[in-house]
Regions:
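Hydrophobic residues on conserved beta-strands that form the core of alpha/beta folds
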Residues: 25-27, 49, 96
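Short acidic/glycine-enriched loop/turn segments that link adjacent beta-strands
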Residues: 32-35
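Domain-level recognition of nuclease-like catalytic cores that cleave nucleotide substrates
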Residues: 85-111
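Short, charged, amphipathic alpha-helix that recurs within catalytic cores of restriction-modification
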Residues: 66-87
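Conserved catalytic cores of phosphodiester-cleaving nucleases, focusing on short active-site segments
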Residues: 37-63, 67, 75
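Acidic-basic catalytic patches of nuclease active cores, encompassing PD-(D/E)XK
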Residues: 1-30
Length: 111
């Protein structure tokens, strides 16, 4: 399992958003074999696995449109692998969120 610092400004912005709301960043750009978790954050008993999608301009649709059923399946599988390697977190309340980073702001959607 590898975790890197934020290599992309959208992920750094999303991490800052969570930190300002009292979350602790447990990992960013975490690679687990063929799976990646953009952000893993925790606040109290809530553990959130985040997929971050950014958009810099007005073309090419909404960032949320970039997350399809296959991407959600891979996110779920990555979370399963991460939890298996971090059994102390198995009792936490887990959720998945897609974070859409746009020029005017940021939107979190629970999936």
């Amino acid at each position: 399992m590898r975790s890197r610092t934020h290599r992309n400004p959208d992920e750094a912005r999303a991490a800052r958003h969570y930190r300002l709301r009292g979350y602790r960043v447990l990992g960013s750009n975490v690679w687990l074999g063929g799976y990646e978790l953009d952000l893993i954050v925790r606040r109290g008993r809530r553990l959130v696995f985040c997929e971050v999608k950014g958009k810099t301009g007005s073309g090419f649709g909404d960032p949320l449109e970039m997350v399809d059923a296959e991407k959600l399946r891979r996110l779920e599988r990555a979370a399963e692998v991460w939890l298996a390697r971090n059994p102390a977190c198995l009792e936490l309340d887990c959720r998945f969120e897609v974070v859409a980073v746009r020029p005017g702001g940021l939107e979190r959607i629970a999936v």
